[in-house]
Amino acid sequence: IPSKKDFLLTQSIFPTVEMRAVKWRTKDSGRFVNVAKYRAFNASVPFATREAWQTSREGALPPLGQKLLVSEQEQILLEDSHGSDQDRLIDLLYDDVERHVEAIRSRLELACGDVLADGKFELLQENGLTLEVDWNVPVENRPTARIPWSDPTSDPIADEQRWIRQLDDIGAPAPELVITSAKAYSYLAENNAYRAAYYGSVSPSTTPTAMLNPQQINVVRGNYSLPPITFYKAQVRVDGKSRRVLPEDLWILVPPDREKWAQTMYGVTAEGLVLSRGTNPEIIREDAPGLIITRGVQDDPVQIWTKGAAVGMPVMHTPDAHIVAKVL
């Protein structure tokens, strides 16, 4: 079952990985090497020092999922049609599979947006579960534009260059792309700095007042070696109400080699383990990680239910390799 096209976070920003485990784990290690020193002839070679570090964190991957019922009344109505609607029951169960998959992927997409927006994975009394994992994103990686970009006198070019220099100063790779909303992007068309850069103006009085089109904005960005922009507009339904996965006021600089930066981790569910030990139905043990759909029956009241289950969450390995800037 394919993911929704708008779900970029779990598809390509936080690449999905399935593990035969129930814990997430991150490691950070490295070393510093000082330069060697010159010496006079016949003088002793100086001793150097070894500087290295390794830190690790781990925690349990939380379970998530849902059930859908085929009620007692629905079963009676299907039976009342003398079995001619048996295919409808089968179709209903298969439709449930798609609903479960979309619901779980939607929740993980929302979780990835939560981690991107504030650097934390948080659950607050969600089905009775409260949880917080702080990935310790440095405050320097969560800047605010000096002047909101909705103000034509702001300077988005200088802001973005400053944020890219911040990444370069700490040795992080140059960002590969920008994720933002169409709303945040729209203000670039009327921005004085962008128009002056496109027309080569040295004075505001000589800058044409026409709005820039997307091609002209891209010319400016190319001239300043700024990364390409990808629009993000995904919404999910939470308790019957639509919710944006990411706020519209964010400008996110995303690094390359993203599997080293952050991932959407799926672990092994109890349902997957049961099926891997069973005979009818049965799955091989290598297929146990990931999203599992099962069916069950209860006799009082008589109900058939389908269940979607997963164990997973977004995990950030390198919390200082990206920028999440508030620009509006």
Kindly give the residue locations of the regions a language model identified.
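Long, contiguous amphipathic alpha-helices that act as assembly "spine/axial" helices in icosahedral shell
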Residues: 61-140, 155, 159-184, 302-308
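Sequence/fold signature of self-assembling virion shell proteins
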Residues: 195-328
